[in-house]
Swiss-Prot record:
GO terms (BP aspect): carbon dioxide transport; erythrocyte development; myeloid cell differentiation; nitric oxide transport; oxygen transport; positive regulation of myeloid cell differentiation; regulation of erythrocyte differentiation
Other notes: The D-minor sequence is shown. See also the entry for the beta D-major chain and the S allele.
Protein name as catalogued: Hemoglobin subunit beta-2
Modified residues (Phosphotyrosine): Y42
Annotated Gene3D superfamilies: Globins
Family matches, as PANTHER family: HEMOGLOBIN FAMILY MEMBER (PTHR11442), HEMOGLOBIN SUBUNIT BETA (PTHR11442:SF42)
Keyword set includes Iron: yes
Organism: Mus musculus
């Protein structure tokens, strides 16, 4: 559960409406793979991840990034029940994929960076603070199965 003020909820909702999931998801996942190269081990089937330009232009990275942002969007619709919303994804990433749960926090931070880039001056410090709360809540929910 994420506790947002009414102003934070409004900021998140208004700004999220401006987001293009095709762009933001792939860019955020791409940044994760470039900035934290050890995360690439979970994406062996994605082909060429040999350089930043290869990663950022990789269609499989973009497609999976869109899936990530689509799931994130579901979380935004269910801020009062993030653990329930992400229960099956938490189980998948824990039991089958064996993803280090710290990577969820890193990806959340990458999403915030990309949102700042795409939203420009509209992404105020207050808006960033609200989104940081959201991505922290999502990361905690995704890591729930690990506890």
């Amino acid at each position: 559960m994420v506790h947002l003020t009414d102003a934070e909820k409004s900021a998140v909702s208004c700004l999220w409406a401006k987001v293009n999931p095709d762009e933001v998801g792939g860019e955020a996942l791409g940044r994760l793979l470039v900035v934290y190269p050890w995360t690439q081990r979970y994406f062996d089937s994605f082909g060429d991840l040999s350089s930043a330009s290869a990663i950022m232009g990789n269609p499989k990275v973009k497609a999976h990034g869109k899936k990530v942002i689509t799931a994130f969007n579901e979380g935004l619709k269910n801020l009062d029940n993030l653990k329930g919303t992400f229960a099956s994804l938490s189980e998948l990433h824990c039991d089958k994929l064996h993803v280090d749960p710290e990577n969820f926090r890193l990806l959340g931070n990458a999403i915030v960076i990309v949102l700042g880039h795409h939203l420009g001056k509209d992404f105020t410090p207050a808006a960033q603070a609200a989104f940081q709360k959201v991505v922290a809540g999502v990361a905690t929910a995704l890591a729930h199965k690990y506890h």
